[in-house]
Regions:
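N-terminal nicking endonuclease/strand-transfer module with a His-rich metal-binding environment
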Residues: 1-180
Length: 180
C-alpha cells in the first residue's frame, strides 16, 4: 500500500463501506501515521524509483457460512492469530461486497516492528545539507555566490535531533511468494 492512512480510512469507514460489520486494530492509529512517515523517509533515502510501500494488505475471502459467527469475535480471533504468528501490527475490517456475495476480511499489516527504545541521533556539531538532502562537511558547500545559504539547503544546529528511528528494517519474508 502506498497510502496506508487513506486505505485504513477507506476500509474502516461506514460512510465508504455499505456492508461493514467489524473493525479491529492491534495498535493505535498514531502507529500508522508514524509508520507511513518512516517508510516515506526511508524510500526517499534509498533513491528507489516507483512507489513507496508503507504497509501491506491481504484480502481474505471467507466462506458464506462464516456469517453465522459473531463478526467482532471472528475478526478479533483472525487478526490476533496473524499478529501472533508474524509479529506484525494489524488493522482489519470485515465486509461484504454490495451484492452480499463475497464475505471477506481486509487485513492491513506492517512490515516493520516498533523498536523497544527509539534511536535518537543528536548533532554533536552543526551539520550541513545540500539541496538534495545530502550531508556535506562544511558550510561553504551550501553557500551561494552572495555568501548566503542556497535555497533548499539546510543546517542542523549542534544539539538538535537530526535522525529519529522508531522502527526496525522491513521484514523481508513478507515480500516472498512462500509467505502468500
Amino acid at each position: 500500500l502506498s497510502n496506508v492512512k487513506g486505505r485504513i480510512t477507506y476500509i474502516s469507514s461506514h460512510a465508504k463501506q455499505e456492508n461493514l460489520y467489524a473493525v479491529y486494530e492491534t495498535t493505535e492509529r498514531k502507529f500508522w501515521r508514524e509508520l507511513a512517515k518512516c517508510n516515506q523517509e526511508e524510500f526517499v533515502k534509498s533513491g528507489t524509483e516507483g512507489k513507496c510501500i508503507e504497509a501491506r494488505e491481504l484480502i481474505i475471502a471467507l466462506p458464506e457460512s462464516f456469517t453465522e459467527y459473531q463478526p467482532e469475535r471472528l475478526l478479533q480471533l483472525f487478526t490476533n492469530h496473524f499478529k501472533q504468528n508474524y509479529g506484525a501490527e494489524c488493522i482489519a475490517a470485515l465486509h461484504h461486497n454490495k451484492r452480499k456475495t463475497n464475505y471477506h476480511i481486509h487485513l492491513i499489516f506492517t512490515e516493520r516492528k516498533l523498536l523497544d527504545e527509539p534511536i535518537i541521533k543528536t548533532a554533536s556539531r552543526n551539520m550541513f545539507y545540500d539541496e538534495n538532502g545530502k550531508h556535506v562537511r562544511t558550510k561553504k558547500e551550501i553557500l551561494g555566490e552572495d555568501g548566503e545559504i542556497r535555497e533548499s539547503c539546510s543546517i542542523v544546529k549542534k544539539g538538535e535531533v537530526y535522525e529519529k528511528k522508531l522502527f526496525t528494517a522491513k521484514d523481508e519474508r513478507f515480500k516472498s511468494n512462500s509467505f502468500l
